[in-house]
Amino acid sequence: MQDNSIFKNIIQRKIPANIVYQDKKITAFEDIKPKAPVHILIIPNFFISSSNDINKKNKWIMSHMFYIAVKIAKQKKINQEGYRIIINCNEYGGQEINYLHMHLLGGKKLKSFS
């Protein structure tokens, strides 16, 4: 799994990224290796390793991440045709960076899991 410092640097704007949304709680930016015409990563502005580390004190961040994902889907005009929201957890779940992040994908018909 990759080091999480890349996300920290994006949040602090120390490295270039196409940030589409940022507030005091989260940052959302375009994936540099998109899997769909719209591929946005949504991350907390504070470190959480994976969804396994969600607890009573920080569970509110998931709600905010989903809320902003829907807001961005509307902004990108993919909300009517449809989109996918994914959170990978740990190695077997496909998580590549040791930092909780949500993928928002859309802009084309996505393959089903069947």
From Swiss-Prot:
Its Gene Ontology molecular function terms?
catalytic activity
**InterPro entries recorded:** Histidine_triad_CS, Histidine_triad_HIT, HIT-like, HIT-like_sf
Pfam families assigned to the protein according to its UniProt record, in alphabetical order: HIT
Organism listed in the record: Buchnera aphidicola subsp. Acyrthosiphon pisum (strain APS)
Tell me the SUPFAM superfamilies matching this sequence: HIT-like
Report the residue ranges that make up the HIT domain in this protein: 6-114
Query: What is the name attached to this protein's record?
Result: Uncharacterized HIT-like protein BU357
Membrane-spanning segments: none
